[in-house]
Amino acid sequence: MSNAIDTKKVVVDEITSKFKDSMSTVIVDYRGLSVSEVTELRKQLRDAGVEFKVYKNTLTRRAVEQVELTGLNDFLTGPNAIAFSNEDVIAPAKIINEFAKSHEALEIKAGVIEGNVATVEEVKALAELPSREGLLSMLLSVLQAPVRNLALATKAVADQKEEQGA
């Protein structure tokens, strides 16, 4: 009997540490997906560095209470899977949202973004943001614009002076 309790404590500790360490977490209802569809989703998430696990709701509730995210308890009913990301805040939401568009059975229930409980709408809004690389390229183009404009203006002045001198 105590062996089963010890095993459950280990699982609760594992879930607790994943909630603490993750930058972004998404809880989904995967009821209605075939095994091949779940495998495809797992592969996409794994390629992005996201861990996708299924835990018992009672064990997840205990872990959620330990990390003081009790707002998630309302969403821990039925078959749930949890996607944890330690690296990219946007990746799990983006991948799951894209997958849900082509697989209606997959339903986003809630999420945790940087330690705060997020609603379905917030998770979907996060999914619509560009990736980190996309944001960096946008920032770079904004930073380059004044320099580019100055270079073009300088070139135009040089061309004008050259025409006047010729």
UniProtKB/Swiss-Prot annotation:
GO cellular component, one term: large ribosomal subunit
Domain of life: Bacteria
Coiled coil: none
Keyword field: Ribonucleoprotein, Ribosomal protein, RNA-binding, rRNA-binding
GO molecular function, one term: large ribosomal subunit rRNA binding
Keyword Zinc: no
Known function: Forms part of the ribosomal stalk, playing a central role in the interaction of the ribosome with GTP-bound translation factors.
Subunit details: Part of the ribosomal stalk of the 50S ribosomal subunit. The N-terminus interacts with L11 and the large rRNA to form the base of the stalk. The C-terminus forms an elongated spine to which L12 dimers bind in a sequential fashion forming a multimeric L10(L12)X complex.
Protein's name according to its UniProt entry: Large ribosomal subunit protein uL10
Source organism: Bacillus pumilus (strain SAFR-032)
Gene name of the record: rplJ
